[in-house]
């Protein structure tokens, strides 16, 4: 029986109007129809609850904007596109808000055990990706300029001063020693090294003797390191000009000598033994770097060298970029600690650049006139390969169109790669 009402009342279930109006009276639908409508509305509400629109916050929107800026800078201004596009897109993926419940796991997010992103992210957390990237770097790096002028290795070491000074600065900001060590490595401008050391020291799992848990800073540190790597052409020139005169920037250097094949083969072997004995904790990075270089220089493993320097490093770079980007979820990334990390990272990068330049000027005090070096190449001791060397080359051509410094600058540049890995190993040995 359909009951009738003299007035039109609304029968609402889950926000849905139920019934039909006829001749000024409201009649209810049958029970089946009521259940169908109720079920449909309930389904729509469930759908809405699971959508990103129901769970989005202003923090998510800010991070989406950051991801879009990364992608824009990579495409529009060619700022490290191989890094910033995967990271930027990963930030977009990581900041799609999803339904959260204690007893409900969709296995979609990067921090949800068993999800695809979480499995891929283990390459970052467990420190698998950085050594594989070092393998590719070694397979594509020519150490001839460093072998021909070994004293320039000191410039790569001088640039690491930014790491240790920033370590003290991070302690002053109130970070725990392991966190400070992970933040300090940003000054090396070496993304893989920064990720490797932060996965060991600032992974959110380590516990201090007083019971305090170390924060998970992998995402902020990685984003800061790669951001400053992309901004090398913006950050370094003002620092170099501030610390050098026009005459110094115009200084010419003797052409590097020719390097024999035997020297090229011996270098990765001797280099591994020397550096790994100094900093055994950096063996995963140094071992893969020199192994990749031996593949290149031996002349009998070209296929392996080509795979390491092309397909392998490209795949790992994509996985590393997209997982690091996805790990920067709004609730994890937008914290006061992240702002402090970016400030310390910028300071570390500037100090490293200045340390390399001042180290070159100090070396000139002890060198004969014909052997003096252009102090600008000291800035290439920052291990953003080959961007720092290109900055020096560009500035040299601006001062003197016939003065080519690229090959000279590559010596401290590749030395900086080794130096940052050694510095990371030293920090690990003190802080683990």
What are these regions (language model features)?
Residues 216-234, 342-352, 377-380:
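Alpha-helical transmembrane segments
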Residues 224-300:
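Membrane-embedded hairpin module used as a gating/binding unit in multi-pass transport
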Residues 143-167, 224, 331-357, 409-413:
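Entry/N-cap segments of selected transmembrane alpha helices
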Residues 272-360:
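Transmembrane helical segments that form the transport core of multi-pass membrane transport proteins
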Residues 122, 126-127, 134-140, 155-165, ...:
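Alpha-helical membrane segments and immediately flanking helix-loop junctions
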Residues 96-118, 135-147, 169-180, 331:
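Transmembrane alpha-helix boundary signature
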Residues 1-31, 37-38:
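Conserved N-terminal/central alpha/beta ligand/cofactor-binding core
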Residues 28, 33-106, 112:
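N-terminal alpha-helical transmembrane segments of multi-pass membrane transport
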């Amino acid at each position: 029986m359909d009951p009738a009402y003299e007035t039109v009342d609304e029968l609402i279930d889950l926000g849905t109007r139920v019934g039909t109006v006829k001749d000024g009276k409201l009649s209810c639908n049958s029970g089946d129809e009521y259940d169908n409508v109720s079920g449909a509305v309930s389904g729509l509400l469930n759908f809405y609850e699971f959508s990103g629109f129901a769970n989005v916050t202003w923090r998510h929107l800010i991070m989406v904007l950051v991801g879009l800026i990364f992608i824009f800078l990579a495409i529009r201004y060619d700022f490290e596109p191989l890094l910033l596009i995967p990271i930027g897109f990963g930030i977009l993926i990581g900041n799609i808000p999803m339904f959260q419940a204690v007893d409900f796991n969709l296995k979609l997010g990067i921090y949800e055990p068993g999800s695809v992103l979480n499995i891929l992210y283990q390459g970052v957390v467990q420190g698998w990706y950085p050594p594989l990237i070092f393998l590719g770097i070694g397979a594509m790096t020519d150490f001839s300029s460093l072998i021909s002028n070994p004293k320039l290795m000191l410039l790569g070491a001088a640039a690491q001063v930014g790491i240790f000074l920033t370590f003290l600065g991070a302690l002053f900001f109130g970070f725990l020693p392991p966190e400070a060590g992970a933040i300090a490595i940003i000054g090396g401008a070496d993304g893989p090294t920064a990720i490797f050391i932060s996965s060991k020291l600032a992974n959110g799992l380590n516990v201090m003797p007083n019971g305090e848990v170390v924060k998970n800073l992998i995402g902020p540190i990685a984003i800061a390191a790669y951001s400053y790597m992309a901004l090398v052409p913006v950050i370094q020139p003002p620092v170099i000009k501030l610390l050098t005169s026009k005459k110094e920037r115009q200084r010419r250097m003797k052409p590097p000598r020719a390097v024999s094949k035997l020297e090229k083969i011996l270098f990765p072997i001797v280099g591994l033994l020397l550096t790994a004995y100094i900093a055994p904790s950096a063996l995963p990075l140094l071992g893969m770097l020199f192994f990749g270089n031996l593949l290149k220089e031996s002349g009998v493993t070209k296929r392996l060298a080509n795979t390491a320097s092309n397909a392998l490093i490209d795949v790992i770079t994509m996985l590393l970029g997209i997982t690091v980007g996805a790990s920067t979820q709004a609730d994890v990334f937008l914290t006061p600690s992240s702002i402090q990390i970016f400030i310390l990272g910028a300071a570390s990068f500037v100090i490293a650049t200045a340390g390399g330049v001042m180290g070159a000027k100090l070396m000139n005090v002890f060198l004969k006139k014909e052997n003096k070096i252009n102090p600008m190449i000291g800035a290439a001791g920052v291990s953003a390969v080959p961007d720092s060397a290109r900055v020096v080359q560009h500035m040299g051509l601006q001062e003197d169109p016939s003065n080519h410094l690229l090959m000279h600058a590559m010596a401290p540049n590749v030395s900086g790669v080794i130096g940052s890995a050694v510095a990371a190993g030293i920090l690990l040995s003190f802080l683990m």
